[in-house]
Amino acid sequence: MSLFKFAAFVLGTAGSVAGHGYVTKIDVDGTTYGGYLVDTYSYEPDPPKLIAWSTTATDTGYVSPSAYGTSDIVCHRGAEPGALSAETLPGGSVTLYWNTWPTDHHGPVITYLANCNGDCASVDKSTLKFFKIDAGGLVDNSAVPGTWATDELIAADFSRTVTIPSDIASGNYVLRHEIIALHSAGNKDGAQNYPQCINLKITGSGTAAPTGTLGTELYKNTDAGIGVNIWNALSSYAIPGPALYTSGSDSNTATSGASPPSTNFSPTTTAAAATTTLSTVVTSAQSTSATVVAEQTSVSYSQTPWPSSTATEATSASSSAGGSNNGHTGTHDEAGHCPAHTGKKRSRLNRRRMASCSSRTQS
């Protein structure tokens, strides 16, 4: 093994055990609720009651493709339902805030809903059938590895806003929000899923009941959007999972990995400069999310909901296993495409990092 490949392997292994991220708070139509702080609440004898589901992923790690057929993929490892629910209406807005996200963990950000058909606090997660309501994938392919929905999330202070479909029937629902990191997906079992779940009570006069897919059937490790090498130039990317539901039609009948929307590009020679607000170049069916919140507010350990007037600037949460991500190093593919790079927590996607990476790869 060459020194270059060995160094990339060592750095990649270090990145795989370091902390990544999780949802720390949720804003539902202007009311703020606490997320499940896995590196804190897991060690408390009486954690607060939340709308967020608990998990046992104290390493803030991921679910790998080899576990797609297990219950861990539904709402993360060892997930249990939250005791509370946040009320919203069809057309309502939900913003989910992550504590942090490594700049090199590029990939799609996907959100689903599933009707609990009863009380979500006692639902059997293995029975939940999810339909996709929001998805972002490859935004710009002008320079490897491209600009992704995760980069938009970082630029929006680690948040993404989704809109509840305007025709959804009233009821109790689980909202499943997920990042799929693809920095190592060129390797077998290399994709990393980070699902997070919350409970919603949707009221109103909607009547739509979209067809859903069991959590254990959302993805296959052979899906084109799962086994992909982002360190090679991509002309398109198919977001994994069932089709995106659009109000007025039940479009959620496609099988895993076979459904649009995908992102298609024409080759260009000039890369547009990245800004703090990124425009998603996708098909019209995918542009469903509302404008993301530009400033992150506080992370609190109090009971929910939180009064929004008490919000203060957030500090990054540290992983119980890996600590701070302020210099997080990711894993690249074993063929040696671009050595691992680091980035500050609030990086605005400096394009020069990949130009430098490309020049080193060619040397």
Curated annotation (Swiss-Prot):
Residues 258-270, 308-329 have a biased composition (Low complexity). GO terms for biological process: cellulose catabolic process. Its main location: secreted. It comes from the Eukaryota. O2 binds at residues 183, 192. Lignocellulose is the most abundant polymeric composite on Earth and is a recalcitrant but promising renewable substrate for industrial biotechnology applications. Together with cellobiose dehydrogenases (CDHs) an enzymatic system capable of oxidative cellulose cleavage is formed, which increases the efficiency of cellulases and put LPMOs at focus of biofuel research. Residues 1-19 form the signal peptide. Binds 1 copper ion per subunit. The keyword Signal applies. It holds the Pfam family AA9. InterPro entries: AA9, AA9_LPMO. GO terms for cellular component: extracellular region. It catalyses: [(1->4)-beta-D-glucosyl]n+m + reduced acceptor + O2 = 4-dehydro-beta-D-glucosyl-[(1->4)-beta-D-glucosyl]n-1 + [(1->4)-beta-D-glucosyl]m + acceptor + H2O. Belongs to the polysaccharide monooxygenase AA9 family. This is AA9 family lytic polysaccharide monooxygenase I. It comes from Emericella nidulans (strain FGSC A4 / ATCC 38163 / CBS 112.46 / NRRL 194 / M139) (Aspergillus nidulans).
